[in-house]
Amino acid sequence: MSRFLNVLRSWLVMVSIIAMGNTLQSFRDHTFLYEKLYTGKPNLVNGLQARTFGIWTLLSSVIRCLCAIDIHNKTLYHITLWTFLLALGHFLSELFVFGTAAPTVGVLAPLMVASFSILGMLVGLRYLEAEPVSRQKKRN
């Protein structure tokens, strides 16, 4: 396995662990969301919205962790890439379309993580596509 894919796997595990922490925080205290993320319109944040956000974050976390474990599973790889695309779209729309988020560290951090992850996973696709060919050459 290429060194890049090993780094990507480590990155996915780290992002997954952080997301699990965010999940716990969303279930524990919904004020976390309007103090850190949705500072533009904090009155729209309630317990139900926080728990929904928590479940979405947990699902993304599990998918990313599974991809780190089985990075050669192309279907899982593409689904994982979509979790980052959806997160990026969500936070950009909350920031620029709906106005529920302000450009604070709480929003800029997930935007950066999603952007770097998308970039890394797109680069990783080239390594995934190249690997089976190099494995076949070694066998012959």
Swiss-Prot record:
GO terms for biological process: sterol biosynthetic process. The chain crosses the membrane at residues 4-24, 52-72, 79-99, 105-125. Its main location: endoplasmic reticulum. Disulfide bonds: none annotated. It is a multi-pass membrane protein. GO terms for cellular component: endoplasmic reticulum membrane; transport vesicle. It is found in: Endoplasmic reticulum membrane. Signal peptide: none annotated. GO terms for molecular function: identical protein binding. Pfam families: Erg28. It comes from the Eukaryota. InterPro entries: Erg28. Keywords: Endoplasmic reticulum, Lipid biosynthesis, Lipid metabolism, Membrane, Steroid biosynthesis, Steroid metabolism, Sterol biosynthesis, Sterol metabolism, Transmembrane, Transmembrane helix. Belongs to the ERG28 family. This is Ergosterol biosynthetic protein 28 homolog. It comes from Mus musculus (Mouse). The gene is Erg28.
